[in-house]
């Protein structure tokens, strides 16, 4: 992960990271729910 000396880009990177984590959380939850539902 490259360091960016511009502090103005930090919130955008954190927002993008939280967005990816949110999508990953939804994906894992849906997989667990479907595997539990069809089991």
Curated annotation (Swiss-Prot):
Keywords, alphabetical: Membrane, Photosynthesis, Photosystem II, Reaction center, Thylakoid, Transmembrane, Transmembrane helix
InterPro entries with a match to the protein in the record: PSII_PsbL, PSII_PsbL_sf
GO terms for biological process, alphabetical: photosynthesis
Annotated GO CC locations: photosystem II reaction center; plasma membrane-derived thylakoid membrane
Membrane in keyword set: yes
Membrane-spanning residues: 18-38
Entry keyword Transmembrane: yes
Compartment(s): Cellular thylakoid membrane
Role description: One of the components of the core complex of photosystem II (PSII). PSII is a light-driven water:plastoquinone oxidoreductase that uses light energy to abstract electrons from H(2)O, generating O(2) and a proton gradient subsequently used for ATP formation. It consists of a core antenna complex that captures photons, and an electron transfer chain that converts photonic excitation into a charge separation. This subunit is found at the monomer-monomer interface and is required for correct PSII assembly and/or dimerization.
HAMAP family (alphabetical): PSII_PsbL
Family designation: Belongs to the PsbL family.
Quaternary structure, from the entry: PSII is composed of 1 copy each of membrane proteins PsbA, PsbB, PsbC, PsbD, PsbE, PsbF, PsbH, PsbI, PsbJ, PsbK, PsbL, PsbM, PsbT, PsbX, PsbY, Psb30/Ycf12, peripheral proteins PsbO, CyanoQ (PsbQ), PsbU, PsbV and a large number of cofactors. It forms dimeric complexes.
Entry protein name: Photosystem II reaction center protein L
Organism for this UniProt entry: Prochlorococcus marinus (strain MIT 9303)
Lineage start: Bacteria, Bacillati, Cyanobacteriota, Cyanophyceae, Synechococcales
